């Protein structure tokens, strides 16, 4: 199964508890379609370069997913219907990176 990097921005009004619930919901949606969540990173509540839906900040998150292309298409379709997710980007990757992403490393400096 191919590997995907799925980065999304959630609404700024979500609490940490609600954000964890959102990620658990995404994870269960993936497992229902035969996919697997491999890694999750929370990058923080960051400012936007421009206003999105009258919001200036959002929770940035990234997950790595192993899924078939058809199950990934179904996952993206359902994510588009979720009002808590403002934007997302899905990229196909060759391999799972080792260690933390650059966003996590930059926040630790």
Curated annotation (Swiss-Prot):
InterPro entries hit by this protein:
Ribosomal_bS6, Ribosomal_bS6_sf, Ribosomal_S6_plastid/chlpt, Transl_elong_EF1B/ribsomal_bS6
Molecular-function GO terms, alphabetical: small ribosomal subunit rRNA binding; structural constituent of ribosome
Q: Which Pfam families does its entry note?
A: Ribosomal_S6 (PF01250)
Q: Which PANTHER family match?
A: MITOCHONDRIAL 28S RIBOSOMAL PROTEIN S6 (PTHR21011), SMALL RIBOSOMAL SUBUNIT PROTEIN BS6M (PTHR21011:SF1)
Q: Extract the signal peptide range.
A: none
Taxonomic placement: Bacteria, Pseudomonadati, Pseudomonadota, Alphaproteobacteria, Rickettsiales
Q: Which organism is it from?
A: Ehrlichia chaffeensis (strain ATCC CRL-10679 / Arkansas)
Name a biological process GO annotation.
translation
Q: What is this protein called?
A: Small ribosomal subunit protein bS6
Recorded family membership: Belongs to the bacterial ribosomal protein bS6 family.
List, alphabetically, the GO terms of the cellular component aspect: cytoplasm; ribonucleoprotein complex; ribosome
Sorted keywords for this record are: Ribonucleoprotein, Ribosomal protein, RNA-binding, rRNA-binding
Q: Does the UniProt entry include the keyword Electron transport? A: no
State the protein's purpose.
Binds together with bS18 to 16S ribosomal RNA.
């Amino acid at each position: 199964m191919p590997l995907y990097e799925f980065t999304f921005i959630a609404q700024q009004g979500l609490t940490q508890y609600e954000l964890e619930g959102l990620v658990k919901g995404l994870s269960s949606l993936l497992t229902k379609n035969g996919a697997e969540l491999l890694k999750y990173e929370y990058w923080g509540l960051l400012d936007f370069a421009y206003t999105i839906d009258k919001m200036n900040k959002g929770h940035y998150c990234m997950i790595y997913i192993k899924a078939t292309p058809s199950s990934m298409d179904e996952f993206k379709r359902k994510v588009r219907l979720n009002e808590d997710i403002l934007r997302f980007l899905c990229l196909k990757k060759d391999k799972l990176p080792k260690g933390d992403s650059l966003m996590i490393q930059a926040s630790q400096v």
